[in-house]
Amino acid sequence: MTLPDFRLIRLLPLASLVLTACTLPGHKGPGKSPDSPQWRQHQQEVRHLNQYQTRGAFAYISDDQKVYARFFWQQTGQDRYRLLLTNPLGSTELELNAQPGNVQLVDNKGQRYTADDAEEMIGKLTGMPIPLNSLRQWILGLPGDATDYKLDDQYRLSEVNYHQDGKNWKVVYGGYDSKTQPAMPANMELSDGSQRIKLKMDNWIVK
């Protein structure tokens, strides 16, 4: 079916909260080598996670629109995940359920859409070109298909530069949650030109 030009409501009351929470500190000292055994071990531990979930604050900022929301991300198996965006009252603005070959999205009016590519669907329905296919790796602190990246002094991902389909995404990590094992990202910012996507993870549950 033809996808309409749907827009999430602009959740302005959350603006100051999200922007403050997602301020990224500068990185200290030189980064570690991507060839280090500590980095390879960290990647292996993260990739062995079968199920995980996280929730927190989401912001999308561009010249055309600003969207602020709460998010909930749940991975239940290989290529099976669920993404919720909610407003300050807790009402669902967007729910996306993805599994191999089938993606379903329900908007805040209860309208249901189906497709086979979650990233393309999100872009068409919300006007936000979120690199969802890559974000699934980046949110875990993994570089995905990117080969240009840097590590922090704890052998964790600190920056990613990824070029694909005319987009030049830069991902900067502001910290990690060491209460989880392995340590998972606590906040991050994606940017491409004037577009910015900010995520602050309140907590992680990993299995």
Curated annotation (Swiss-Prot):
Gene3D superfamilies, per the entry: Lipoprotein localisation LolA/LolB/LppX
SUPFAM superfamilies: Prokaryotic lipoproteins and lipoprotein localization factors
Lipidated sites in chain (S-diacylglycerol cysteine): C22
Assigned keywords, A-Z: Cell outer membrane, Chaperone, Lipoprotein, Membrane, Palmitate, Protein transport, Signal, Transport
Entry GO CC: cell outer membrane
Residue ranges that the Swiss-Prot or TrEMBL entry lists as coiled coil: none
Entry superkingdom: Bacteria
Record's function text: Plays a critical role in the incorporation of lipoproteins in the outer membrane after they are released by the LolA protein.
Protein family according to the UniProt entry: Belongs to the LolB family.
Protein name, per record: Outer-membrane lipoprotein LolB
Source species of the chain: Salmonella typhi
Encoding gene (name): lolB
